Amino acid sequence: MLDIQTYRDLESFRKRYRAEAPGWPAAVQQAIRTLAISGIRDPLSDQPIPPDRLVVSGPNLRETIEADGLNSRQRAELIVLRRLIEAGELLPLDKLRMYVSEAVTPFARYLQARVPHLRSSEYLPEPDHWLRGKVANRDIRRIGLPPAALQCVLCNEVFEHVEELDKALVGIAEVLNLGGYLLATLPLAYGQYESVIKARWRGDDVEPELLCEPEWHGDPVHPQQGSLVYQIPGWELLDQLRRAGFRDAALHAVSSTSYGVLGEELPIVFVLMAKR
């Protein structure tokens, strides 16, 4: 089973939520039982992955159901990528000029093995970081690639940490060619239009202004300190993308027992898609 529903505004999702939310907890439990019996398939190749290779390491199903270096939300993003390729919106993986904003993660290694023209990087502001010189160092606010150099950009769990999100979105639009795509996963304030602002950036050499108790998420290249959350984007993110130069912006709600795509609070995973 694979279900993808596309939303371009909050109200269209609210209608579904009001109609279906009471039955979602039972649907999640049934899906878990199905995965335990049948296993899943790889999101790009459709190769079967048996149940004994699935790892569920906690209750947050969006971040687990791990297999072959991918978790639930990452498979959701790759399903959307595959659909764009199959629809002729993007070139096949062996010809696709792609950038992913991570380089040392299992997800990055999965792509590095399949996308010959992949560029990958980490954010390494410290001049003495041990990864300097081993992987590319890029700031998502200014990727540093020529205009229209890319056909696809993937960002996973990045936008909540970006100090100047509007600036980053403009920069991403500039490095994509006309018709190129941004795909991203992020924690979403799915019930509201406004983003939840948790901290404000005040400059490179100034501590950020904290508007609430600081929230830190895990960061594979800064495991001791993590990464500060500046905002949890709401549905206004779609309008921010349109202002940044994207012709279309939408959120895909993906769920699939066949591919192991589930959430817990919601039985879906949101994948952001924006077309240049």
Where are the regions a protein language model picked out?
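Aromatic-residue hotspot detector
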Residues: 51-52, 150, 244-247
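S-adenosyl-L-methionine-dependent methyltransferase catalytic module, highlighting the catalytic core
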Residues: 2-20, 26-40, 127, 163-275
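A short His-aromatic
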Residues: 157-161
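Conserved N-terminal segment of class I S-adenosyl-L-methionine
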Residues: 1-148, 199, 256, 260-274
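Hydrophobic beta-strand segment of the Class I
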Residues: 153-154
